[in-house]
């Protein structure tokens, strides 16, 4: 087997520097597509004999040499020779895919937009979540209920020209109550009228009576806070006077504390009496 060829292309990674006088390869034909292009002659430098070899055509495309340290020898002049006993040729086989992937057809932008428009239209028409029964508005159901109730239970009104006779004992308290509490009566009538007109679904606005009760509760809470602050200040003054040994300061703080308590106690009974009086009047008016 010859190792160096002239006029032939191989994929061997070994680079050699040869002299034409010692290694001459005579190709029989210059064409690489004929069978004779794979036949060559070479001379062995050790024995000087000419040997003929046949090179595989697969070496041109995917063949390569497998070399070791014993596969080549070097001369004093730098020439490299290969030994056939320590050299082998291997080939790479190209694997061919039998099962190929099917290419998906590329969809155009217009088709994508049309699909999107169809999906949006289905959402709008309600074809995605179809309802078994159409939803009727609440107002129509209330109207049907009212009509059916009127048909089933007829209502008749009668007018009685005779006015009820009121006793003279009950007239003055009623007038007095009307003069004293006109605001609460107006609040009640206003609430009743708003409830009858607006209906069950509407929320009536807050009345003046509720606002007055809220104002009284806020006043009581502010008075409680003020009392707590005064008690804290007086206790601090007493503690400072006792710790410092200043008797006059302690006596003055105690006197101020007693005066404040008495003033608060005097102011509270009047308001409590008024509240009790109003409460008793409400109870009597309801009983009558």
Curated annotation (Swiss-Prot):
GO cellular-component terms in the record? Answer: membrane
Membrane topology, record value: Multi-pass membrane protein
Chief subcellular location = membrane
Key words of the record: Membrane, Transmembrane, Transmembrane helix
Protein name in UniProt: Transmembrane protein 71
Taxonomy, superkingdom: Eukaryota
Give the family this protein belongs to, as stated in its UniProt record: Belongs to the TMEM71 family.
